């Protein structure tokens, strides 16, 4: 199902499911809050304060680059990540703390392209012409650590958000930990610093 959860279904004080924007009700034994920056709004409905800011990032996906790259690269000095994805190439970068503002900054886009081309001189700005940029918000917690674990006072609700720039990298480990918590197992690692 692809729809936003907008509220919780309760039996007394216990959360037993979610209501979606389309008006559907979905019940479950466990509810996982894993909506990135959008988790803030939903968590408030539980009386939970989950401080996060949106960290705006940009990317371009070149559908069939004229030069094929085979390895992922993190260009630290240029603040750009390069990810080959099948026949396409994703070039991403920047981190702009912005709340929920998803407006596009031409200066930031230009910086991503210029830095990429500086490290990969076989590419030029012309390779990016006509490519629509993507903009998204990373969920940034104040200390950079994700919110991961049972929500206090809500035994059936588990949080898994706030991974900043490491969401995709930490997804396998986060999924593994959430699976342990959902199945009722004790966490194999201490999560108290992540609460």
Question: Language-model features: where?
Answer:
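Active-site substrate-recognition segment that forms the wall
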Residues: 7-10, 14-15, 25-155
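Glycine-centered tight beta-turn/hairpin loop motif at sheet-sheet or coil-to-beta transitions
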Residues: 21-23
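C-terminal lid/capping helical subdomain adjacent to the catalytic/cofactor pocket in oxidative enzymes
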Residues: 10-12, 145-195
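A conserved beta-strand/loop element that lines the FAD pocket in flavoprotein oxidoreductases
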Residues: 1-6
């Amino acid at each position: 199902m692809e729809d936003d959860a907008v509220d919780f279904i309760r039996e007394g004080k216990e959360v037993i499911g979610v209501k979606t924007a389309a008006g559907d009700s979905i019940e479950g034994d466990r509810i996982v809050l894993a909506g990135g920056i959008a988790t803030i709004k939903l968590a408030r409905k539980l009386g939970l304060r989950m401080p996060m800011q949106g960290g705006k990032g940009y990317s371009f996906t070149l559908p069939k680059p004229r030069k094929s790259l085979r390895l992922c690269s993190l260009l630290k000095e240029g603040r750009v990540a390069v990810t080959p994805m099948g026949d396409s190439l994703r070039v991403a970068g920047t981190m702009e703390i912005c709340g929920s503002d998803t407006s596009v900054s031409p200066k930031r886009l230009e910086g991503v392209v210029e830095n990429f081309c500086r490290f990969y001189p076989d590419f030029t700005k012309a390779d990016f012409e006509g490519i629509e940029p993507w903009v998204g918000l990373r969920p940034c917690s104040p200390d950079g650590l994700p919110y991961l674990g049972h929500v206090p006072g809500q035994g059936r609700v588990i949080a898994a958000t706030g991974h900043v720039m490491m969401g995709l990298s930490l997804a396998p480990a986060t999924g593994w930990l959430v699976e342990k918590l959902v199945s009722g197992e004790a966490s194999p690692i201490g999560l108290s610093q992540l609460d």
